[in-house]
Regions:
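Active-site neighborhood of phospho(di)ester-bond hydrolases with catalytic His/Asp-centered motifs
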Residues: 6-8, 29-35, 55-60, 80-83, ...
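Generic structural signal for conserved hydrophobic packing positions in ordered secondary structure
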Residues: 43, 72, 81-83, 100, ...
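Short, surface-exposed charged micro-motifs
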Residues: 71, 117, 145
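Helix-adjacent hinge/juxtasegments
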Residues: 53-94
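Binuclear metal-dependent phosphoesterase catalytic core
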Residues: 75, 98-104, 121, 128-164
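A short helix->loop->beta-strand "cap" motif at the edges of active sites that frequently abuts
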Residues: 50-53, 124-125
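Active-site environment of divalent metal-dependent phosphoester hydrolases
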Residues: 11-15, 37-41, 61-66, 87-92, ...
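N-terminal active-site segment of His-dependent metallophosphoesterases
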Residues: 1-50, 62-68, 140-142, 146-153, ...
Length: 164
């Protein structure tokens, strides 16, 4: 069983990102979906201590050399990650669902809207947004956890505890 900590839209709130890492407990992979990739560098030592692979993409507020799109495989499932602004996710998830189909991804993880969402495309592909740790639109900072096994993917949105 793999457990992925999924974060997005931290926008300089490194303390919230650190809190999510602590609150998530043990996890096998770390994903940051952009805005701001520099925040990942601030917590990279924590992630390296745990021996956790880091996957990140850049968002519309990032100017780093990070890629716009990445994918990886876990337990025979294909996970695609992107920020979402190029797919216009603030307006509709239709193009994201088509993108998932085109890439043959079992799950597409995206950010940009600052609103957590667990949805499935018309072909049953997971479309997952962990919300925002830095500037949540619904008032509560959130992150995501994905439990992945050969049986499938169990998505979960988690509210961030108070940052100390």
């Amino acid at each position: 069983m793999n457990k992925i900590l999924v974060t997005s839209d931290t926008h300089g709130h490194v303390a919230a990102l650190r809190q999510a890492i602590v609150q998530a407990g043990e996890f096998t992979h770390f994903v940051h979906l952009g805005d701001c990739t520099a925040d990942v560098e601030a917590v990279r030592p924590l992630l390296e201590e745990r021996g956790v692979p880091v996957y990140q993409v850049r968002g519309n507020c990032d100017y780093s050399g990070a890629e716009l799109y990445r994918e990886f495989h876990l337990d025979g499932l294909k996970i695609a990650i992107l920020h979402g602004h190029t797919q216009r996710v603030k307006y509709s998830l239709l193009s994201l669902g088509l993108f998932a189909e085109q890439k043959q991804a079992d799950a597409v993880l995206f950010g940009h809207t600052h609103i957590p969402k667990v949805e499935y495309s018309s072909t049953g592909r997971l479309l997952f947004n962990p919300g925002s740790l830095g500037e949540p639109r619904l008032g509560q900072a959130t992150f995501g956890l994905l439990l992945i096994s050969r049986e499938g993917i169990m998505p979960r949105i988690v509210q961030l505890d108070a940052v100390h």
